[in-house]
Amino acid sequence: MANTPRYWLVKSEPGCFSIDDLAALPGQTSMWDGVRNYQARNYLRDSMKRGDRVFFYHSITGVGIAGLCEVASEPYPDPTQWNPEDRHFDPASPADAPRWYVVDIRLVKKFARTIPLNELRTLPELAEMELLKRGSRLSVQSVREGEFLAILAYAEEDCP
């Protein structure tokens, strides 16, 4: 069971970092930094593992699931927390007891089109999905296997 991949969804504002930005990077891989919510941090630090599958979700504009990624590293301390030049700088985070963590994510596939929320709401398998619950704002969310498979099947059927 320890080697069984888990499933996640990460949110990003395309104006800050989009799936196209990820696709343009060497190895199509990036550190997923700047998470400053404790529950989201706990997912990154305590639960995400290399090989887990991740949906890349665009928020604010072009809202929806834009593609599929994978976790490409084990969790490690977010270096931006100690960089005073970075907008994610946290002066209260000691170097010997990091407060914030990251994982690297690698692009697996950009979907032919972003799958919007209103379409996700039509899939019965997603009735209990965290993303679709009122007030759900967490930037890192777990996804149940059935939800993951339903979205992936929909994306492949709709966006080959």
Label for each model-derived stretch:
Residues 68-138:
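Aromatic- and Lys/Arg-enriched surface recognition patch
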Residues 2-14, 74-77, 121-122, 126-160:
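Mixed-charge, low-complexity intrinsically disordered regions
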Residues 57-63:
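Short, charged beta-turn/beta-strand-edge "cap" motif at the junction between a beta-strand
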Residues 9-11, 56-57, 68-70:
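Short, conserved beta-strand edge motifs with alternating hydrophobic and charged residues
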Residues 1-50, 147-148, 155-160:
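Compositionally biased, charged N-terminal/linker segments
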Residues 6, 65, 101:
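Residues that flank catalytic or metal-binding motifs in active/ligand-binding sites
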